[in-house]
Amino acid sequence: MGVYASFSFRILTNAEALNAVEPLGNIIRHRRATIIVPKNDRHEVFTVPAVSGEAIRHGYQLIMVKLAKARGINVCKLCELGEFVKHGVPVLIENLEKDLHEVLSSKDTSLPDKELKVLETCAIEDVGGFLIPMEDIQIKRTSRIEVSYMLPAIDDLKFGLDTQFHVRSASQSQQAIGRSRDQAQPQSIYYVESASAVYTFTININLSEIGVVSNCLYSTTSEDSESSPDSKKAEKSGKKSGNKRIEIIDCKSKSLATDERVRRAELTIDALAELVKNGLIGGHHSSYSPHWQPISGVALVTRPIQTVVYPGHVRNYVQKTANLAKGNKELLGDMYNYEIFTYWDKKLDPGLDVGDVKYAEDITQFFKDVKSKALEWLKEELGMK
């Protein structure tokens, strides 16, 4: 079984500089991406402003940190600082979290137990994944969230990309100290590229695997050594390689308490709601905070397999998502279940085709409805009332 949530949004964004890349002289350039767009009977290539999935993930995880701390959910020291190196620097673990370092570096601790220790330590690494390069082994966890690039919707492909002139001046300070060739000039001229567009991006969440280890295939260090208490219960492959014995365990036997898994699933959805409502991603917010307005969105909660929503590039993306889910139901039968949710601001996204799908006019209500169904199904899966 599994419970999944997939989201796509259309965001009207004006005058944003969320994702800068390398400067060109005194010009701070906006990230760009090359896309293929169908035009009549052919395809055309366009270069458009973009915001990377990494920038979105960073903002997403920052919000998760703040909510987790407020709710008493464990967060490691570096994630709390917004440094998402995910225990990827062993020297930092050794100095900042000695108890964790002892577990991760121990040859007597199995790989699943090492991963579980990290999950207990930090909800952000549980949800966002990590790669910890230890001396003898790499501990890897794939992210439970998947994030796309944020791109202009291709239905109209209307966007603006401008270079804005800026001056930073400290004329009184310069006059006070006097000016010479080797001293700073009284003003600094620079340019910032900003963009405006109806953007769209997609986020997928694997709710069932939050709080559950993923390293279920591992080896003991010696043929002659006794199996650990957990490995005695494991399903053994019976294959030996050198002095190693390969073993498999049931991943769900190594997981957090069910109520903690639900809390973290709720945290993940709530953090996404704050990100979408407020646009807390990228940089330049101190002087270039974007005019950010979510204008429509669709969510699909499914079980037991994931169905990714149709991206918000076209005005009938909600209807296409509904048709996709209906098709899966016809194909897979009673084993497959889904619920679809829609948000729509009619004034800001005119001409959107939602078909016969019911929609919420308030984005907060949209997220409440999604969370209610997702957590209901997750609790059913975990055997909670």
Give residue ranges: language-model regions.
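Basic polyanion-binding and macromolecular-assembly surfaces
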Residues: 1-48, 65, 69-72, 81-385
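Active/ligand-binding-proximal structured segments within catalytic/core domains
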Residues: 46-61
